[in-house]
Amino acid sequence: MLKSFKTEINPTIEQKIKINKTIGTCRYVYNFYLGHNKTLYDNGEKFMTGKSFSVWLNNEYIPNNPDKIWIKEAYSKAVKKSIEDGCTAFTRFFKHQSAFPNFKKKGKSDVKMYFVKNNTKDCRCERHRLNIPTLGWVRIKEKGYIPTTKDGWKIKSGTVSVKADRYYVSVLVEIPDVKIANNSNGGIGIDLGLKDLAIVSNGKTYKNINKSTRIKKLEKKLRREQRCLSRKYENLKKGESTQKNIQKQKLKVQRLHHKIDNIRTDYINKSIAEIVKTKPSYITIENLNVSGMMKNRHLSKAVASQKFYEFRTKLKAKCDENGIELRVVDRWYPSSKICHCCGAIKKDFKLSDRIFRCDCGYVEDRDFNAALNLRDALTYEVA
């Protein structure tokens, strides 16, 4: 069984320079691969795969262009991984699974430094530090979070990333499969929404964290800092500001974005952990059409803030870890319109109606009624 662990690291100045150089090289090679294939397509030539491009880059392009020799200075496995990512992006585009790959812009795109275990000395982990290829020993801020290799845990691979001037490492650890006893409790249904994050059929409701005072204050501060950044760009055109001041202000904005994102992620993690601790035999959720909801300009911001996809992904991981069956009901299943008492479908039930009232006399909150119907749904797919 493979499990990932992500935590913040505290690299030295020399290690930070190496990380930034490697990430910059990976971004350049990724963009170069995209641009090269775009040129081949415009000229009517055959598409070049990631493996063919890697051979051409190392054996033909760099030897014939001495000014690009700095590409060789970066960690080779990280550069090769960036080419593979570009090839994957093109493959998804050809299968009509995503749009045409975009070029990664410096400071705005999420580029990571990939590393893999090459020998027995690489990827060793102790309680307070981790050995990363080309970087050496790097100190971990959260001591004891990553399983140590002294206890028999094996680190297969990992990535180093930078967000808002903070450095993180994510490692993939091979852990033994644990035999989990069957959960004797009944199943539960979870209805996700915008008013509240999750309404559970056992009566528990997880509020929308974005409506809390803490998030609202941070978003207000973020808008203020973004206006300040916008003014600095305007002053730069007039010659009244400098790039250094803009970089400082951009870092302030990035840190606020990162802080808000961490609060939302932490709330999702704690909510899922609390749900799983009840040890249900199964959990049923609805397959929401998030991409369709994002097209509504009045709802897109609220939908993105709730992070429905992350909730489902992490819930599945926790269910797999604890031996709980995760059931997914079709998006067209009328969970909100079905009376949980008599089973009648109320076709004229509107989104503005918050209370479900049936002719049989059953009265209940629409979201809780939907959670009960999801729990008792008979048509589903196992995630």
Would you name each region that the model predicts?
Residues 3, 17, 148-151, 163-383:
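Positively charged, helix-rich recognition surfaces that bind polyanionic ligands
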Residues 6-8, 85, 129, 168-170, ...:
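Beta-strand secondary-structure signal
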Residues 33, 78, 82-93, 366-378, ...:
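Stable alpha-helical structural segments in soluble proteins, enriched in small hydrophobic residues
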Residues 52-166:
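Acidic carboxylate diad motif detector
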Residues 30-37, 41, 90-97, 196, ...:
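A generic secondary-structure signal for well-formed alpha-helical elements
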Residues 4-8, 137, 157, 187:
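Well-ordered beta-strand positions in beta-sheet-rich domains
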Residues 1-80:
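Gly/serine-rich nucleotide phosphate-binding loop at the start of the catalytic core
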